[in-house]
């Protein structure tokens, strides 16, 4: 492979060889009655913001399976370490298992060093793992925490790239949430301001994206405390039933009634006795 790369002149631009390969495979599968698998559609709104004393993370609670709401109240804010939490978007199994694995590795790191892990350490572990799998692990993450160097907030993409920003959003409802952040964010906010801002951002994702919905969960991390607010608010409250919606028997008049007996022929009858001894 190295010899080929040495003797071949580099060619600029994009390579569309895989596109032609996929077209040939699709045509071949179509002849045999098969279809190529489609990409999994996922839906979530997760967000985080840095305030004066720490981090506020937020997420909705709807889990979808295609166009079906599979779970109305699932938790998308995952424990990494006592001072670090992580919101997950994408494939639910991938986000769960990825955060559990990194949490376990960070616990071993903490036991070895004798101190709480830094947020940058968790970020490095996550990005290296996701890059190793080249995007096949469908986990888009918002990592936040507070360590000896202060509050830190990262967005981690499924292919392993990361950003460190004062406010981040990810998921299918991220555009609506980002619009709220860009309009109302300001540096050095108080805790209540930050909680309200993240709640409004998640609510924007819930009301503008079908893949997001149900409740709003928040996680507030500072040097002095950790608050896991589940739920922080319920923007989609179920309506109250004020009465019975079934008609009483006899409400609808029966004009005619016809009963047709079924004539069945018993071909075989098997009787099994139950052992009562």
From Swiss-Prot:
One of its GO terms (molecular function) is endopeptidase activity. Keywords: Cytoplasm, Hydrolase, Nucleus, Protease, Proteasome, Threonine protease, Zymogen. It is found in: Cytoplasm; Nucleus. Belongs to the peptidase T1B family. The keyword Cytoplasm applies. CDD domains: proteasome_beta_type_7. Residues 1-43 form a propeptide. The 26S proteasome consists of a 20S proteasome core and two 19S regulatory subunits. The 20S proteasome core is a barrel-shaped complex made of 28 subunits that are arranged in four stacked rings. The two outer rings are each formed by seven alpha subunits, and the two inner rings are formed by seven beta subunits. The proteolytic activity is exerted by three beta-subunits PSMB5, PSMB6 and PSMB7. It is an enzyme of class 3 (hydrolase). It comes from the Eukaryota. PROSITE patterns: PROTEASOME_BETA_1 (PS00854), PROTEASOME_BETA_2 (PS51476). One of its GO terms (biological process) is proteasome-mediated ubiquitin-dependent protein catabolic process. It catalyses: Cleavage of peptide bonds with very broad specificity. The active site is at residue 44. SUPFAM superfamilies: N-terminal nucleophile aminohydrolases (Ntn hydrolases). GO terms for cellular component: cytoplasm; cytosol; nucleus; proteasome complex; proteasome core complex; proteasome core complex, beta-subunit complex. InterPro entries: Ntn_hydrolases_N (IPR029055), Pept_T1A_subB (IPR000243), Proteasome_bsu_C (IPR024689), Proteasome_bsu_CS (IPR016050), Proteasome_sua/b (IPR001353), Proteasome_suB-type (IPR023333). Its EC number is 3.4.25.1. This is Proteasome subunit beta type-7. Component of the 20S core proteasome complex involved in the proteolytic degradation of most intracellular proteins. This complex plays numerous essential roles within the cell by associating with different regulatory particles. Associated with two 19S regulatory particles, forms the 26S proteasome and thus participates in the ATP-dependent degradation of ubiquitinated proteins.
């Amino acid at each position: 492979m190295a010899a080929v790369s040495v003797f071949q002149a580099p060619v600029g631009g994009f390579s569309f060889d895989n596109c032609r390969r996929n077209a040939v495979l699709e045509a071949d599968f179509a002849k045999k009655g098969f279809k190529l698998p489609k990409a999994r559609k996922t839906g979530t709104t997760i967000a985080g913001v840095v305030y004066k004393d720490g981090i506020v993370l937020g997420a909705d609670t709807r889990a979808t399976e295609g166009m079906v709401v599979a779970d109305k109240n699932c938790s998308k804010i995952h424990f990494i370490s006592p001072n670090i939490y992580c919101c997950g978007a994408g494939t639910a199994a991938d986000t769960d298992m990825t955060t559990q694995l990194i949490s376990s590795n960070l616990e071993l790191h903490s036991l070895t060093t004798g101190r709480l892990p830094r947020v940058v350490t968790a970020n490095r572990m996550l990005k290296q793992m996701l890059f190793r799998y080249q995007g096949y692990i469908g986990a888009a993450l918002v990592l936040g925490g507070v360590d000896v160097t202060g509050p830190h907030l990262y967005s981690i993409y499924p292919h392993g790239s990361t950003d460190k920003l004062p406010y981040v959003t990810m998921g299918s409802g991220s555009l609506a949430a980002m619009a709220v952040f860009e309009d109302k964010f300001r540096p050095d906010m108080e805790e209540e301001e930050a909680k309200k801002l993240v709640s409004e951002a998640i609510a924007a994702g819930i009301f503008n994206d079908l893949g997001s919905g149900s409740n709003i969960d928040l996680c507030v991390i500072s040097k002095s405390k950790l608050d896991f607010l589940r739920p922080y608010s319920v923007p989609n409250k179920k309506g109250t039933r004020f009465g019975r919606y079934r008609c009483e028997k006899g409400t609808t008049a029966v004009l005619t009634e016809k009963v047709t007996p079924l004539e069945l022929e018993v071909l075989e009858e098997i009787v099994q006795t139950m052992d009562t001894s």
